[in-house]
């Protein structure tokens, strides 16, 4: 599993009925009017969505991996869940490293520590200076070392070198962004 990249207003069949059962009111009128105008309702929505994603995706995913004799390694960073809880469910919590924000790894390694996980992995050296096309192909070796050292200091102990090594033969262009 790579990353659960999500957007706002995620919905699925039955979400409204289970929401009403759990919270005691109908969410549909608020969704129609714009849930962001109702902070308390938005909080309930996000709480319910987090439970849906955790119970309906992450837990079954981890169980399936384990049933097949595999480990689950997941980046939960964009997940609409309580990421500390979600990271504690997977076998190998994974972060990613960027020179412009190495501190996020602390959340991942903290969750791993609290749930007795031995490995914390990182998709390392991707988007070193921020997202797409910011100094692309201008990474400096010294910066790679700074990032790796910061990741180790923040509790990451398994680096997956991601990016240039995976480009097709004869190409030095990474176009998946």
What do the predicted segments below correspond to?
Residues 1-83, 164:
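Polysaccharide-binding and catalytic clefts of secreted carbohydrate-active enzymes
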């Amino acid at each position: 599993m790579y990353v659960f990249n999500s957007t706002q207003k995620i919905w699925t069949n039955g979400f409204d009925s289970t929401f009403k059962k759990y919270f005691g009111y109908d969410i549909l009128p608020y969704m129609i009017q714009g849930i962001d105008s109702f902070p308390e309702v938005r909080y309930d929505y996000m709480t319910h969505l987090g439970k849906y994603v955790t119970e309906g995706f992450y837990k079954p995913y981890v169980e399936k991996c384990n049933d097949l004799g595999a480990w689950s390694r997941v980046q939960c960073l964009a997940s609409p869940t309580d990421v500390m809880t979600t990271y504690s469910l997977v076998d190998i919590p994974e972060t990613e490293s960027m020179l412009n924000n190495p501190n996020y790894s602390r959340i991942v390694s903290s969750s791993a520590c609290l749930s007795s996980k031995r490995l914390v992995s990182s998709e390392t050296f991707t988007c070193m200076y921020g997202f797409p096309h910011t100094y692309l192909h201008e990474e400096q070796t010294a910066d790679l070392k700074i990032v790796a050292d910061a990741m180790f200091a923040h509790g990451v102990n398994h680096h997956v070198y991601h990016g240039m090594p995976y480009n097709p033969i004869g190409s030095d262009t990474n176009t998946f962004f």
